[in-house]
From Swiss-Prot:
Organism: Buchnera aphidicola subsp. Baizongia pistaciae (strain Bp)
InterPro entries per UniProt: PCRF, Pep_chain_release_fac_I, Pep_chain_release_fac_I_sf, Prokaryotic/Mito_RF, RF-1
One Gene Ontology molecular-function label: translation release factor activity, codon specific
PTM sites of type N5-methylglutamine: 235
Highest taxon of source: Bacteria
Any one GO CC term of the record: cytoplasm
Protein name: Peptide chain release factor 1
Length: 362
């Protein structure tokens, strides 16, 4: 391990032990704000500290084992042990590098997930319903809460478009690579001759912005229209102008919400989605401008992004970005998405690592 990284880790280790001591101090315990702040920092450092301690223990074992090489009787055993320890150390060093990667500040945020049917007509809308159920089930596995913000039903089933708010720590970080085009290849229920059709849905995942960011929006940039709800709502449907449509004039972004009976609640929801979209667009443009010449696995949520193909006849799911193929379509649609999500996150981390050769701790 390079000396600069060792210094960085030693510094973090000292800070970890310092906080550990402070958290048992009565003065700190009595100060709730300080205690909470230190607890959060302690939690952030715990994984990197654990890996560093493991690395130091492993390094100590290497030094001890090298001494055994001088013993002719133990030489072969010691050599095998050194090979095992060397592999273990390299694995720990890789884990440490990943833990020291620059964090996306939005990764721990809640997110909005939007699904829009694209090419394929009714079949695309039906598949958007399949994707919606897939993400809802995955959210349930993660113990995240979901709340539908807006949806437009399709006559043959599914949705023309649907927006869901997903609340749970790390939901954006886990789902952000879902943004892009999702293509389905199957025989539609409406197909009488058994021909396979290809349809596409577009998924966009954006972080929910804090309330203070929403308050900064210039009201003069917004056009707010109210109209009568056309969705569920019992006797209140079509009797009051509770539905809200907000247009951000400079960007042309439009968000509708008619899920709530209250116009005020619909407006708050629509505004939250709108501002999150605007901020996400700004982040994308910044990322595009500052990007080093490397592939960007994080999609834009545009039709041009081709993420996955779901082939029903072959029970196959293909992630085109990393050439990953799995034959468990039923399980994937049942919400068991980690088989696709974890590899793309690992690939992204590997890409970032390969471009961090000049970072301060390497």
């Amino acid at each position: 391990m390079k000396s600069s990284m060792m210094k960085k880790l030693e510094s973090l280790h000292r800070r970890y032990e310092e906080i550990e001591s402070m958290l048992s101090d009565r003065t700190v315990i009595s100060n709730q704000e300080k205690f909470r702040e230190l607890s959060q920092e302690y939690l952030k450092l715990s994984d990197i500290n654990y890996c560093f301690v493991q690395w130091k223990n492993c390094n100590h074992d290497v030094i001890e084992t090298k001494l055994l090489l001088l013993d002719s009787e133990l030489h072969d055993v010691a050599e095998q042990e050194l090979q095992m320890l060397s592999k273990k150390m390299k694995k720990i060093e890789t884990e440490i590098q990943v833990l020291l990667l620059p964090c996306d500040p939005n990764d721990q945020q809640n997110c909005f997930l939007e699904i829009r049917s694209a090419s394929g007509g009714d079949e695309a809308a039906i598949f958007s319903g399949d994707l919606f159920r897939m993400y809802i089930k995955y959210s349930e596995f993660q113990n995240w809460k979901t709340n539908i913000i807006h949806m437009t039903h399709s006559l043959k089933g599914g949705y023309k478009d649907i927006i869901v708010k997903i609340t749970g720590k790390g939901s954006y970080g886990k789902l952000k690579f879902e943004s892009g085009g999702h293509r389905v290849q199957r025989v539609p229920k409406t197909e009488s001759q058994g021909r396979v059709h290809t349809s596409t849905c577009i998924v966009a995942v954006i972080p929910v912005v804090p309330k203070k960011e929403i308050e900064k929006v210039n009201i003069n940039d917004l056009k707010i229209d109210t109209f009568r709800s056309s969705g569920a709502g019992g006797q209140h449907v079509n009797t009051t102008d509770s539905a809200v449509r907000i247009t951000h004039i400079p960007s042309g972004q439009v968000v509708e919400c008619q899920d709530e009976r209250s116009q005020h609640k619909n407006k708050a929801k629509a505004l939250s989605v709108l501002v999150s979209r605007i901020k996400a667009a700004e982040l994308y443009n910044q990322r595009k401008k500052n990007a080093i010449q490397r592939r960007d696995l994080l999609g834009t949520g545009m039709r041009s992004d081709r993420n996955r193909t779901y082939n029903f006849a072959q029970n196959r799911v293909t992630d085109h970005r990393i050439n990953l193929v799995v034959y468990c379509l039923d399980e994937v649609l049942d919400g068991k998405l980690d088989v696709l999500i974890e590899p793309i996150i690992q690939e992204h981390n590997a890409d970032v690592l390969s471009n961090l050769s000049n970072i301060e701790f390497l």
